[in-house]
Design a protein with these regions (language model features):
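N-terminal segments that mediate ammonia production and transfer
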Residues: 1-134
């Protein structure tokens, strides 16, 4: 069964506790069952860059392929970070469509979770506490 938690902080002094506060709220939803859990993380928007967050159950192979393909096909600086079964790609806004096409063509087992200047979405199957720990 689906359950959604959200936290809109009006008190900026709590910003550094956002992850902890949201995690506790999500874990409280555990009694709904081990279906799936996820979080959306918003950062400061970038003017000229966007982020693509992808997820793969075959991350060892997919992410190695992803990094290799992107470095081969793009002629500019690229920032990729890996977080368990997710990868976040930061690139110039003008390259986002091209990167999405590369992902679709070369890494069909990867799923695009989010695209945007400030958002990263992480989603997994399992108990919320397990998802948060990853």
């Amino acid at each position: 069964m689906c359950g959604i938690v959200g936290l809109f902080l009006k008190d900026h002094s709590l910003q550094n506790q956002l992850g902890q506060l949201l995690s506790q709220m999500l874990i409280t939803m555990s009694d709904r069952g081990p279906d799936s859990a996820g979080v959306a993380i918003y950062g400061e928007p970038a003017n000229t860059e966007s982020k693509i967050t992808i997820q793969s159950d075959k991350q060892n192979n997919d992410f190695e392929t992803l990094e290799s393909i992107l470095r081969e096909k793009l002629d500019e600086r690229l920032d990729i970070s890996f977080k368990d079964t997710h990868a976040v790609i930061r690139a110039n806004n003008t390259k986002i469509k091209f990167i999405l096409e590369l992902i679709e063509n070369y890494i069909p087992t990867a799923r695009v979770m989010s695209v945007g200047s400030s958002i990263e979405i992480y989603k997994e199957t399992g108990m919320p506490s397990s998802v948060i720990d990853r």
